[in-house]
Amino acid sequence: MAILIDENTTLLVQGITGSFGARHASLSLAYGTKLVAGVTPGKGGQKFENIVPIFNTVSKAVNETGATASAIFVPPPFAADAILEAADAGVELIVCITEGIPVMDMMRVKEALRGSKSRLVGPNCPGLVTPGLGEKSHGGCRIGIAPGYIHKRGNVGVVSRSGTLTYEAVFQLTQLGYGQSTCVGIGGDPINGTNHLEVLDMFNNDPETEAIIMIGEIGGNAEVDAARWAQQHCKKPIAGFIAGATAPPGRRMGHAGAIVGGEEDTAQAKKRILAECGIAVAETPSDMAKTLLERWGK
């Protein structure tokens, strides 16, 4: 089953002719993702790698190809409008990779998407991967920038605010012989489209997902909200990791949202609350998979 995406998901890439977008569109194609369209204003009629048609607008791309998901590789000043254009075109899943989108722009996007049929993942995220059954997990769906080859098809769901920690958890699981159902990078900005709790809910309802790794960091209360929800509603084993244990209060650490503001924003407080809610907490990044397997009884 997986969540959000599978091998049948049809993808368009906004910003496909930029160097970053082109690089990762090419990698997604090689992974086996059904990349059916690209969008760059003024480049309509061209083809990406002589295969994928490029359109001037998202609505034209959706009408011509039936794309159901979009990956956005658009510079920060234009990314909010790119998200809204995809939503207006009826794209079901919008994955925004762009980092550095102004907070006011994201507030406008968040309000505009309220009640919309479109789901936003990101911004400032690595995207999603549902591994395939081929060699190095090829044949699945890769949207974003995550390295596909470290994945393996299996039964562990991964949700994370951090891209690199997502890859670390995935690699550990794969090395130990345990694959992933879907890996979701929700992004590290203070305002994002999809949070930990929503992804946990999807994993909880997914018959293919048997266990979950949830990775968070200092700042905000998303992990705390998710843990308290899971205590009441999630029957599947969860391991958690919170980054930023040595971060000084009031200083941003990497992600725009990674800043200690309130009492429950610290790594120590989040780890304590996760443990109180029945989540097995890994003390270091290298312990994430091992901690899950211990809780899972594997």
PLM feature spans:
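Catalytic-core regions of core metabolic enzymes
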Residues: 1-298
